[in-house]
C-alpha cells in the first residue's frame, strides 16, 4: 500500500490555523457581547434586537450558496478561495466596528437601523465570503486526509484560544478603554485591526494546488457550467451535507446559549467576570482535545467513532452542569463544563476533514467537484445557528421581563436565564450526538469505492485526471 502524498509543512498548517484568530475576533465578540452591549450600554430593547437579527438571517441562506458557487467558479493566480478570504475580511473589519460604534446621539429608530445594516452586511456578505473561502482551503491546498484533520485541529486551537481570550478579557478591556460606548468602540477597532493582520498572514501562508492537480480540463469545464439550481440539488441530495449543516447550526445555536453566560454571570452569579472564568473551563479542555484529535483519528482509522463517543461524553457533561447549576454549586459547574468541552473538542478538530469526505461523496455519486459550495455549511451554520440563537435569546429575555436598565432583574428573567444557560445546551448536545451517530460518511465512501472496484489512490487519480 503506497504512502499518501503530503503537501504541507508544519508552518503551512500553523499559518492556516491562525486564520481563525481573525474569524473569532468577529464571531466571539458578536455572539458573546453584542446583545449585552446593545441592551445595557446603548439601552435598546432585547426583543426588538432579536427580531432584527432574525430578519437579517433571511439573507444568509441565499448568500452562503451564492458565495460557495462563486468560489468554485473563480480562477485567479492566487487560486479560487484566497481572494475571497483576503478581501472579505476588509469588509468584516469595517462592519464589525460599525456594529459596536452606534452613535449615542441618534434616536432609537436610527440606532436600530444602524445596527441592522452593519450586522446584515457583516454576516450576510463579508463574513460569508471570508469564512466559506477559509474553510474551502482545506480541500484546495491538500488532498491528504491526515493533513486535513491536522489543519482542522490547528484551526480550532486558534479559534478556541481566541474565543477564550476575548471572553475572558473583554469586559475588563472595555473598562480599561474608558467604559461605556466609547470603550466598546475602541475595543472593536483594536480587535478588527488584529483580525485584518492575522487573516492576511493566514491567507498568504498556504498555496492552493494548481488546476492540473485538482482536475483536468474536462472536469474544470464541468465545474464552471453547473448552475445555481444544480449546485443546490447536489447539496440537498447529499444526506451527509445536510447532517453536517444541521449539526453546525445546532452547534452555533449552542454557542449563542452559552453566550447567555454574560447575563448569567452578571445577574445570577452577581459577578460578570465569572463569564471569563467559565471561558477558561470551556476553551482549555477544547484545546487539549484538539491537540490529541489527529493522533486518535489515525489510531482509530477514522473519525466516526471518535466523534460519536466523545459527544456522548459532552452530553453527560452538560446534563451534570445543569444539575450543579440548579444546586448553586459553582465549582461543580466549572468541573462539568470542562468535561463537556473536552467531549466536544474532537468534532471541532476533524469537522473540516468530514466535510471534505462529504465533498468526495458528491464526486463519487454525482461526479461533480463542489468543494467551495460544500463548505457553505460552515458559514451557513455560523450565521443561522449563531444568529437565530442570538435572536431567540433577545426575544426570550424580553418575554421574561428583562430590562438592561435594571440593576436587579425580576424572578421571571432569572428563571429564563437558568433555562437558556443550563437546560437548552444539554438538549442541543443530545440532538447533535444522535446526528453524529448516523454520520458515517467514511464508510459510505468506502462502500461506493468497493462497489466500483477502485482503490483510494485510483479515486484521487480519477478526480485529478
Predicted segments with their positions:
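Membrane-embedded alpha-helical bundles of multi-pass transporters/translocases
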Residues: 2-464
Amino acid at each position: 500500500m503506497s504512502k499518501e502524498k503530503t503537501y504541507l509543512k508544519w508552518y503551512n498548517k500553523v499559518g492556516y490555523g491562525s486564520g481563525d484568530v481573525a474569524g473569532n475576533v468577529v464571531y466571539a465578540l458578536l455572539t458573546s457581547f453584542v446583545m449585552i452591549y446593545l441592551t445595557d450600554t446603548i439601552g435598546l430593547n432585547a426583543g426588538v434586537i432579536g427580531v432584527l437579527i432574525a430578519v437579517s438571517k433571511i439573507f444568509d441562506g441565499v448568500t452562503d450558496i451564492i458565495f460557495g458557487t462563486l468560489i468554485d467558479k473563480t480562477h485567479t493566480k492566487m487560486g479560487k478561495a484566497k481572494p475571497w478570504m483576503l478581501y472579505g475580511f476588509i469588509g468584516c473589519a469595517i462592519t464589525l466596528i460599525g456594529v459596536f460604534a452606534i452613535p449615542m446621539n441618534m434616536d432609537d429608530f436610527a440606532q436600530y437601523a444602524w445596527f441592522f445594516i452593519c450586522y446584515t452586511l457583516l454576516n450576510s456578505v463579508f463574513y460569508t465570503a471570508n469564512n466559506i473561502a477559509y474553510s474551502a482551503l482545506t480541500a484546495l491546498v491538500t488532498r491528504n486526509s491526515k493533513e486535513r484533520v491536522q489543519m482542522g485541529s490547528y484551526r480550532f486551537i486558534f479559534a478556541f484560544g481566541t474565543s477564550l481570550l476575548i471572553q475572558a478579557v473583554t469586559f475588563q478591556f472595555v473598562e480599561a478603554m474608558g467604559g461605556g460606548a466609547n470603550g466598546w468602540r475602541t475595543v472593536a477597532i483594536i480587535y478588527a485591526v488584529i483580525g485584518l493582520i492575522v487573516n492576511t498572514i493566514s491567507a498568504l501562508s498556504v498555496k492552493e494546488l494548481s488546476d492540473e492537480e485538482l482536475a483536468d480540463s474536462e472536469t474544470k469545464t464541468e465545474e464552471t457550467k453547473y448552475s445555481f439550481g444544480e449546485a443546490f440539488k447536489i447539496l440537498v441530495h447529499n444526506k451527509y451535507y445536510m447532517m453536517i449543516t444541521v449539526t453546525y447550526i445546532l452547534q452555533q445555536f449552542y454557542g449563542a446559549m452559552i453566550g447567555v453566560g454574560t447575563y448569567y454571570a452578571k445577574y445570577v452569579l452577581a459577578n460578570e467576570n465569572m463569564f471569563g472564568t467559565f471561558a477558561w473551563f470551556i476553551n482549555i479542555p477544547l484545546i487539549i482535545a484538539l491537540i490529541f484529535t489527529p493522533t486518535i483519528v489515525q489510531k482509530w482509522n477514522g473519525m466516526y467513532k471518535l466523534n460519536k463517543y466523545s459527544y456522548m461524553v459532552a452530553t453527560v457533561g452538560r446534563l451534570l452542569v445543569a444539575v450543579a447549576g440548579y444546586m448553586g454549586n459553582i465549582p461543580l459547574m466549572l468541573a462539568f463544563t470542562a468535561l463537556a468541552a473536552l467531549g466536544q473538542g474532537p468534532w471541532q478538530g476533524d469537522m473540516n476533514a468530514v466535510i471534505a469526505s462529504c465533498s468526495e461523496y458528491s464526486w463519487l455519486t454525482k461526479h461533480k467537484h463542489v468543494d467551495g459550495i460544500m463548505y457553505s455549511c460552515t458559514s451557513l451554520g455560523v450565521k443561522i445557528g449563531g444568529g437565530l440563537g442570538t435572536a431567540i435569546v433577545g426575544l426570550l429575555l424580553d418575554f421574561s421581563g428583562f430590562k438592561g436598565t435594571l440593576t436587579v432583574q425580576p424572578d421571571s428573567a432569572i428563571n429564563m436565564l437558568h433555562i437558556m444557560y443550563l437546560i437548552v445546551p444539554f438538549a442541543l448536545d443530545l440532538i447533535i450526538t444522535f446526528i453524529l451517530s448516523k454520520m458515517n460518511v467514511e464508510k459510505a465512501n468506502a462502500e461506493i469505492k468497493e462497489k466500483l472496484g477502485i482503490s483510494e489512490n485510483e479515486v484521487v487519480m480519477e478526480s485529478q485526471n
